[in-house]
């Protein structure tokens, strides 16, 4: 499509050259009509009669005058072109870099006037929870990368202040279980439903059964993949070798059978373990059939195209010796389930993961910071959580959950690997879900997620550094902060019979904060980097200044939360509660 010609712009741009043509044309006329033959005489006479020449407003149409006028306009055009071509680009005070620290006016458009509707980042900076601000250019996702070495205050200066905001549902990784004790009562008093998954003390945990959240065959595949990724031993090559693929087939077949065929109370890991224990392969007898083989034979007779049957057929292609090795590997992988307490913990479900975005809920995931034996349980839970919430947002709520779900993932490197987390973190924003990834150093993320680590970091619009000394983290942060231009002067002294002194001023570039300066940063300070905004060097948030601080057990020990008392209290029937009554008819004794 041809672009429309802007006549007004064309006239304005060429008007100076028209004036130049007119002026030079008139001067040529004056010079031509001046008396005399010598150049000096004509020049003198021309200046004397210049007023009379311009008395006639029309240009001279004499060919010589017109030619000289055109030449004058062309020379002006050429001069303007050459000046523009050779123009110097000066950025006063920014010759070597324009980095600077952010100011209050820089963060103001990103914060909500209502303090309680902000994500707390520092003492002076925050981020509005409104995902659709009036001006879309100020919209930022709520994914946050928090980096802080041991003792830098990740829990005190970030996790607790944000729990006190109470504007969302929360899923909190809680090493040692202290956050639940300190913040649980505050949340309960403000109408939150409290859930707890405790992998340190199973008796203090609510029950979690991954089988309760299987909705389709693809969920079976996701569950199997999460188990494989988070329980692989040192002997596995890459997680995709022959043996692991064979294990996946076997797990998929068994879980598929349990999900389709078992009664509700048997849909759990205990049944899966019993099926594996009932399996047997004999190297010297390929025709031998164990109880599980017979069970699948019976299912195949009824439903030859059953999902579980198809997977089991592929597994049974393995020879006796190979099948025996697969069974040994499966048994070793699920060895933690030999612990009766773990089997009981995962026998049925109380978590209601798919309801966390429906109402204000706080789920505390308590893990050990010294032992990762049961971290695969946490990884399975998080994997199912993200997928369930995304599916519910899409299928029930037209793409956005009614209550925002914030995942405060403390000790993120210790909760196992969430499959395809790099893809999840890029898509959860639109569903009103966000993740705060809390690490001791950025290298921890690369250790777990390898090449996907950069994608995960790139999908966090906000980075908060609370302190640390890990070299790669310091280097990357210093580079991101950029360079500023500073003034530099040198002095020189020459000693001789005639002493002389010199003073030389110049400009140079310097990192806004070098690696060594970041390493020795004041313990009360932090660095905040928000996408599209200058970085901030600010005070860490003072938790005692929060309006809800007095509701924490930090302020008053009587505010300590007891999960066992809370669970027993939930079992007491209140007089005000209502129930649905179903008439089941008469029940005959056997």
Give residue ranges: language-model regions.
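Conserved long hydrophobic alpha-helices within structured protein cores
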Residues: 115-121, 376-384, 477
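Basic- and hydrophobic-enriched, low-structure N-terminal and domain-boundary segments
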Residues: 1-152, 156-159, 203, 588-590
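General secondary-structure edge motif
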Residues: 99, 126, 142-143, 310, ...
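A short glycine-/small-residue-rich loop at the edge of a beta-strand within enzyme catalytic domains
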Residues: 108-109, 376, 412, 468
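Short alpha-helical interface patches
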Residues: 53-56, 65-118, 217-227, 275-278, ...
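Conserved ATP-driven motor cores of ASCE-family P-loop NTPases powering translocation/secretion/packaging/pilus
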Residues: 425-527
